[in-house]
C-alpha cells in the first residue's frame, strides 16, 4: 500500500504545483513565486472522487451547493493564497453535509507552506490596488498563523489576520 500512496502523493504535489504556476501567470507574478513563498511546504485544498453532493461554500451570507462533476477535482484556495494574492484570490469557507441515504467519499489534500515560511502580499500586487486594500493583509510566519487558526478555525478569517498582525 505504501508504493501506491507515494505515487498518489507525488501526483498531487505535481497538480498543486501546476495550479500555483497558473496562479502566478494569472496574477502576473514571476514564475514559481507562490511555490517559493511556500518555502518547501506541501494552500490549496482539493477534494477528489465523489459523485454525491454535500460540499457547500459560504458566499454572501448563505451556503451554496457545489455540484459534483464526473472526473472533476474541486480546489479551494486557503488564507495563505488570499494573502499572497493581496485579495485577488479569496479563501472560501466550506463544509460538507451528510446526505441521508447516500455514501459520500472524498479525499481532502492540503498543500501548505512550510511552518517557517513568511507569507505576505506579493509586492507586485500591492502596487496594483488602492492603499486601503494594501493594509488589509499582514505579513506573518505561517506557523504563527496556524497557531491562531487552530484556536479560531470556525470564525471569520479577518480576526485571524488581525491577531497574527499583532504578533
Where are these regions (language model features)?
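C-terminal flanking tails of non-heme Fe-dependent oxygenases
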Residues: 1-167
Amino acid at each position: 500500500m505504501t508504493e501506491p500512496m507515494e505515487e498518489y502523493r507525488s501526483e498531487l504535489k505535481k497538480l498543486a504545483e501546476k495550479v500555483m504556476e497558473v496562479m502566478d501567470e494569472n496574477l502576473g507574478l514571476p514564475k514559481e513565486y507562490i511555490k517559493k513563498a511556500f518555502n518547501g511546504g506541501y494552500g490549496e485544498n482539493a477534494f477528489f472522487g465523489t459523485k454525491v453532493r454535500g460540499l457547500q461554500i459560504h458566499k454572501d451570507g448563505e451556503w451554496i451547493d457545489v455540484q459534483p462533476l464526473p472526473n472533476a477535482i474541486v480546489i479551494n484556495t486557503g488564507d495563505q493564497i488570499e494573502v499572497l494574492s493581496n485579495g485577488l484570490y479569496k479563501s472560501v469557507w466550506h463544509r460538507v453535509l451528510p446526505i441521508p441515504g447516500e455514501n459520500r467519499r472524498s479525499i481532502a489534500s492540503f498543500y501548505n507552506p512550510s511552518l517557517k515560511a513568511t507569507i505576505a502580499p506579493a509586492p507586485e500586487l500591492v502596487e496594483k490596488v488602492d492603499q486601503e486594500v494594501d493594509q488589509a493583509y499582514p505579513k506573518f510566519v505561517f506557523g504563527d498563523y496556524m497557531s491562531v487558526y487552530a484556536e479560531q478555525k470556525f470564525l471569520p478569517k479577518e480576526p485571524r489576520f488581525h491577531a497574527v498582525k499583532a504578533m
